[in-house]
Amino acid sequence: MGMSFSHLLIVLLIIFVLFGAGKLPQVMSDLAKGLKAFKEGMKDDGNDNDKNE
């Protein structure tokens, strides 16, 4: 049971209503930075395990 297009549209509409048009670009920017930092952290974590073994 995946998300259909209508479900995705409803979720995006709710996010738009909660954050408003002015705040939405800042929220998306912060989310992207957080995801990038998480990916870099996971990449660094994998390298540390190889060095310790």
Curated annotation (Swiss-Prot):
<dbReference type="GO" id="GO:0043953">
    <property type="term" value="P:protein transport by the Tat complex"/>
</dbReference>
<keyword id="KW-1133">Transmembrane helix</keyword>
<comment type="similarity">
    <text>Belongs to the TatA/E family.</text>
</comment>
<dbReference type="InterPro" id="IPR006312">
    <property type="entry name" value="TatA/E"/>
</dbReference>
<keyword id="KW-0812">Transmembrane</keyword>
<dbReference type="GO" id="GO:0008320">
    <property type="term" value="F:protein transmembrane transporter activity"/>
</dbReference>
<keyword id="KW-0813">Transport</keyword>
<keyword id="KW-0811">Translocation</keyword>
<protein>
    <recommendedName>
        <fullName>Sec-independent protein translocase protein TatA</fullName>
    </recommendedName>
</protein>
<keyword id="KW-0472">Membrane</keyword>
<dbReference type="InterPro" id="IPR003369">
    <property type="entry name" value="TatA/B/E"/>
</dbReference>
<comment type="subunit">
    <text>The Tat system comprises two distinct complexes: a TatABC complex, containing multiple copies of TatA, TatB and TatC subunits, and a separate TatA complex, containing only TatA subunits. Substrates initially bind to the TatABC complex, which probably triggers association of the separate TatA complex to form the active translocon.</text>
</comment>
<keyword id="KW-0997">Cell inner membrane</keyword>
<comment type="function">
    <text>Part of the twin-arginine translocation (Tat) system that transports large folded proteins containing a characteristic twin-arginine motif in their signal peptide across membranes. TatA could form the protein-conducting channel of the Tat system.</text>
</comment>
<dbReference type="Pfam" id="PF02416">
    <property type="entry name" value="TatA_B_E"/>
</dbReference>
<keyword id="KW-1003">Cell membrane</keyword>
<feature type="transmembrane region" description="Helical">
    <location>
        <begin position="1"/>
        <end position="21"/>
    </location>
</feature>
<dbReference type="GO" id="GO:0033281">
    <property type="term" value="C:TAT protein transport complex"/>
</dbReference>
<keyword id="KW-0653">Protein transport</keyword>
